[in-house]
Amino acid sequence: MKKTLVMFAGVLFISGVVLLSTASVSLAYGEHSQRLAANLLVLQGDLRQLLETDTSDIHLHSLSLRIKEKLGLLALLVRSANEQDSTSNTHNPEEFRQLLFLFGSSELKPLLSKLESLSGKYPLVLSPILQSTFSPVFFKKAEEMHLRLCSGCHSGAMAENTLPAFDLFRQSRSISRLEFAARMLTGLRGDQLTSLQNPLTDTELSVLISYYRNEVNELSK
């Protein structure tokens, strides 16, 4: 018990330091810029699934719907990012307008190449705490967050729905940690720009990511 309390105290201290270090980053790298970068990574992951030959028809349909929706969202995200940082409008909406055309023309490989290039220009910058891996001592708290926020849709039971919500334990281990973090950042607020901000702190998100990637989940077996 004493060891656990010491570890939690350590995390609180680290979180405080991270808040100071991330504050300066946030000034130059705002919420909309982060959302833009995260959506670019999620789009690449969805597009790679779409290109896989063993993807089921129902998943192909749902992936197509999600990709089209996210591509349409990018231009709005660019404008919002520019408004948030009016001192340097580095995000050019013209770079994103051709993406929907490529998708509508079934030019999927050129589209993937373009998205990868854009991610190089607009990388997802994570705070140090979001890049950290937490030990199993924190997984009880993560389990509570999972049951409260995620399990209703992401238990795996909805995997064959028109818009499937995949098992997060399995998904987190089948893709890179960066892409999974991007999916958590975008998924917790939904796809609508006007929805509520992410309800979790970076520390809570990082604990959840560590939990999904490392915990043995009986329901996922």
Outline where the language-model segments fall.
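Positively charged n-region of N-terminal signal peptides that target proteins for export
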Residues: 1-4
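Bacterial N-terminal signal peptides
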Residues: 9-21
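Immediate post-signal-peptide N-terminus of mature secreted/exported proteins
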Residues: 24-65
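Electrostatic cytochrome c docking/interface patches
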Residues: 30-32, 110-145
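Short, solvent-exposed, charged loop/turn and helix-capping segments
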Residues: 49-97, 162
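C-terminal capping alpha-helices of c-type cytochrome domains
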Residues: 73, 95-124, 197-221
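The canonical Cys-X-X-Cys-His
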Residues: 142-158, 184, 208-212
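Gly/Gly-Pro-rich "capping" loops immediately C-terminal to redox-active cysteine motifs
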Residues: 155-190
